[in-house]
Amino acid sequence: MAGYGPKALALTGRVADGFILQLADPYLLEWSMRYVHDAAIAAGRDPKSVKVCVAAPAYVGSDLAHQHNQCRWFGGMVGNHVADLVARYGERGEIPGALTDYIRARQDYDYGHHGKAGNPSTDFVPDDNVERFCVLGTVEDHIAKLEVLKELGVDQFNIYLMHDAKEETLDAYGKEIIPALEAQSPV
């Protein structure tokens, strides 16, 4: 079950076999997993029985500014869900500022560009959010971030390849990133 808000996260912990978080921010993963785990415990379940999947854009390369621009669409997509959370819980409610602060500059969102690199409706998304929500940088940067996520309890990582380096990124995952992660700590 995927979710961002406290109610959806608690429901996930109570009944779901798995939790999908559509962003790769370690802080927000920890925050989300607290709700999932607390609800699982309250329901008499082992919180570790709820498998965790992080799904986010991955872009391997050395030009971070270009990667930010290519993956900024994702912050806009997440921003749509965050806007709903702010409407429900308030700007300074249960949802951390690390998730809500950036949408203050959000204006109208045109779904005609949804999920596409270069989406003009996502200009409000700062580089910092793109970097936190996605997995960007060199092969070594990807390995480091994925290791952090794994240490926090992520069982599976799903990459989105909606940018101009699909083949290169996929090749890097197949040839370098996945083998390095498997060598460090086989599952």
Per-region residue spans from a language model:
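Loop-centered beta-sheet repeat module
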Residues: 4-40
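Glycine-rich, proline-tolerant flexible connector loops at the mouths of alpha/beta enzymes
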Residues: 23-26, 158-171
